């Protein structure tokens, strides 16, 4: 069941001389309840602009928006009253890269601030705020000030505050971008736990594919305001169609670094380099040994890695295949039958044109 439906959403920003910049261009997404939906792309791709249309912090120029069964926008026009919109926004929590904490108040007071519209006694307010801090494993820091916390702890406070109204949706807008790897992992683990514990729908906006790989169930890739690819995380990771997606998912930076360090000579017509991406669970035997046995080509491994894709082990190999054109064709066909995704690379690790 979809909790968020975006259909043909545009966001136009007027410029001088009557020109328009199309920050979001005809985007359609269906996000189901309980998804961890990653939206990934480089800076300026339109990710943040798009997700801010969900709660109408950014008004769309065209399209339809429906959230949890309520129509917010129809044909680019707001159809929900401002009063009802204010109530509906309480069901959508948001966290940001910059934390947005009140520096002059304690951690407990920061969380309590999000409950100011509730008719709670002081004791009830404190109890509720402490419960939220306990949820993010930060109850012991209740009387600390933000300046006394690490970046990861500040983000935990922001998450506790975002959960104050028991939302069904949490939007994470580059929330881990300013954190070190350890704190990033802890925040991602927390988001995943909250997703499972409360069936919380999480929308993860990031330019870091690693964050999406670790916890997302579905992913959309954005470029120049458009969604160029979308699907389940496994589908997009194992079978990317667009070049940008291949760059995001392939561990290509490590592969490029490795190939550059090898200083390979220019490849002959009987030599090809391929990046192979596959599910370790589905490919039980050694791919290289099987290629040699079945096809008779010579295969050299140049790079190898195994990582977890939302708890599923995924292997990445970069191999040099030597053989005549017919043998190379047979090798490609054999690998594709094994559900291995192939991307041809040049000797420097770039995607082969």
Swiss-Prot record:
Coiled coil: none annotated. CDD domains: ABC_MetN_methionine_transporter. Keywords: Amino-acid transport, ATP-binding, Cell membrane, Membrane, Nucleotide-binding, Translocase, Transport. It comes from the Bacteria. The keyword Ribosomal protein does not apply. Its EC number is 7.4.2.11. InterPro entries: AAA+_ATPase, ABC_transporter-like_ATP-bd, ABC_transporter-like_CS, ACT-like_dom_sf, MetN_ABC, MetN_ABC_transporter-like, NIL_domain, P-loop_NTPase. It is found in: Cell membrane. GO terms for molecular function: ABC-type D-methionine transporter activity; ATP binding; ATP hydrolysis activity. Its main location: membrane. ATP binds at residues 41-48. The keyword Membrane applies. It catalyses: L-methionine(out) + ATP + H2O = L-methionine(in) + ADP + phosphate + H(+); D-methionine(out) + ATP + H2O = D-methionine(in) + ADP + phosphate + H(+). One of its GO terms (cellular component) is plasma membrane. Residues 6-249 form the ABC transporter domain. Part of the ABC transporter complex MetNIQ involved in methionine import. Responsible for energy coupling to the transport system. Belongs to the ABC transporter superfamily. Methionine importer (TC 3.A.1.24) family. The complex is composed of two ATP-binding proteins (MetN), two transmembrane proteins (MetI) and a solute-binding protein (MetQ). PANTHER family: AMINO ACID IMPORT ATP-BINDING PROTEIN, METHIONINE IMPORT ATP-BINDING PROTEIN METN. This is Methionine import ATP-binding protein MetN.
């Amino acid at each position: 069941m979809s909790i968020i439906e975006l259909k043909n959403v545009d966001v136009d920003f007027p410029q001088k001389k009557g020109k328009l910049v199309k920050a979001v261009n005809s985007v359609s997404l269906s996000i189901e309840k309980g998804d961890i939906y990653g939206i990934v792309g480089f800076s300026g791709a339109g990710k943040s602009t798009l997700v801010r249309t969900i709660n109408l912090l950014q008004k769309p120029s065209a399209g339809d928006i429906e959230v949890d069964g309520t129509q917010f926008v129809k044909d680019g026009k707001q159809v929900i009253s401002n009063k009802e919109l204010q109530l509906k926004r309480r069901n959508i929590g948001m966290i940001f890269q910059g934390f947005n904490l009140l520096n002059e108040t304690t951690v407990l007071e920061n969380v309590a601030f999000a409950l100011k519209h509730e008719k709670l006694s002081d004791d009830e307010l404190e109890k509720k705020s402490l419960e939220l801090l306990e949820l993010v494993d930060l109850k012991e820091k209740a009387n600390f000030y933000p300046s006394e916390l690490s970046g990861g702890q500040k983000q935990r406070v922001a998450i506790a505050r975002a959960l104050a109204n028991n939302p069904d949706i949490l939007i994470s807008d580059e929330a881990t971008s300013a954190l070190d790897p350890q704190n990033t992992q802890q925040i991602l683990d927390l988001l995943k736990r909250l997703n499972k514990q409360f069936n919380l729908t999480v929308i993860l906006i990031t330019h870091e594919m690693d964050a999406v790989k670790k916890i997302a169930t579905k992913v959309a890739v954005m470029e120049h305001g458009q969604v160029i690819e979308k699907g389940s995380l496994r589908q997009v990771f194992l079978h990317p169609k667009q070049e940008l997606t291949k760059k995001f998912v392939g561990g290509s930076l490590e592969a490029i670094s490795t190939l550059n360090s090898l200083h390979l000579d220019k490849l002959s017509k009987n030599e090809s380099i391929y990046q192979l991406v596959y599910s370790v669970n589905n490919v039980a035997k050694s791919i290289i040994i099987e290629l040699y046995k079945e096809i008779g080509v010579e295969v050299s491994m140049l790079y190898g890695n195994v990582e977890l894709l939302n708890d599923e082990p995924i292997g990445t190999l970069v191999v040099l295949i030597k053989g005549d054109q017919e043998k190379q064709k047979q090798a490609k066909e054999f690998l594709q039958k094994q559900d291995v995704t192939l991307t041809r690379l040049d000797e420097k690790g770039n995607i082969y044109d």
